[in-house]
Curated annotation (Swiss-Prot):
5-phospho-alpha-D-ribose 1-diphosphate binds at A128, N129, G130, K131, A132. This is Xanthine phosphoribosyltransferase. It comes from Stutzerimonas stutzeri (strain A1501) (Pseudomonas stutzeri). Its EC number is 2.4.2.22. GO terms for cellular component: cytoplasm. The lineage of its organism: Bacteria, Pseudomonadati, Pseudomonadota, Gammaproteobacteria, Pseudomonadales. The gene is xpt.
């Protein structure tokens, strides 16, 4: 998606050969026009897949997921990372490790919102080693729902996430595929 790549080139900051900072438009400050375009693109790619729910993880996956949900006309569920007084019974949970934050957390979704009748599109801001995606897949599998695929805003293709997910049989659609962050420069695949 050229609009996204242009934004990464102009506003992304390479912090190391493994970390890309995009807080100017995606995971701190949000560019709503770009998010709308991202939602449209995910909807275009998954429109014919019978999606009934979109599942993401808080917090940075919420904006692109909501825009895709708006375009597809389906609800969005975000897995919570933090305990809540209102979210405590009948939970589907998984443990995930955050590459960026270097911390493990338990994510949770209420069984009220996800069932075996659902066909799910997973959306997330980044795909690196695939830990968050695998956690969401675990939760969706616990519910007995089916997975149409994964929509990723930015994929770090030099890490193993995509390969592992595809080898497990999942469809991965990434809007920007980063081949390298070497020498402080973003290099894209395609």
């Amino acid at each position: 998606m050229e609009q996204l790549k242009d934004k990464i080139r102009s506003h992304g900051i390479v912090l190391s050969d493994r970390v890309l900072k995009v807080d100017a438009f995606l995971n701190h400050q949000i560019d709503p026009v770009l998010m709308q375009a991202i939602g449209r693109e995910f909807a275009r790619r998954f429109r014919d897949d019978g999606i009934t729910k979109i599942v993401t993880i808080e917090a940075s996956g919420i904006a692109p997921a909501v825009m895709a949900g708006l375009e597809l006309g389906v609800p969005v569920i975000f897995a919570r990372k933090h305990q809540s007084l209102t979210l405590h019974d009948n939970l589907l949970t998984a443990t995930v490790y955050s590459f960026t934050k270097q911390v493990e957390s338990t994510i949770a979704v209420s069984t009220q919102h996800l069932s075996a009748n659902d066909r799910v599109l997973i959306i997330d801001d980044f795909l690196a080693n695939g830990k968050a995606a695998k956690g969401l897949i675990s939760i969706i599998n616990q519910a007995g729902a089916s997975i149409a695929g994964l929509g990723i805003v930015i994929e770090k293709s030099f890490q193993t996430g995509r390969k592992e997910l595809e080898e497990a049989g999942y469809r991965v659609e990434s809007l920007a595929r980063v081949a390298s962050l070497a020498d402080g420069a973003v290099q894209f695949i395609d």
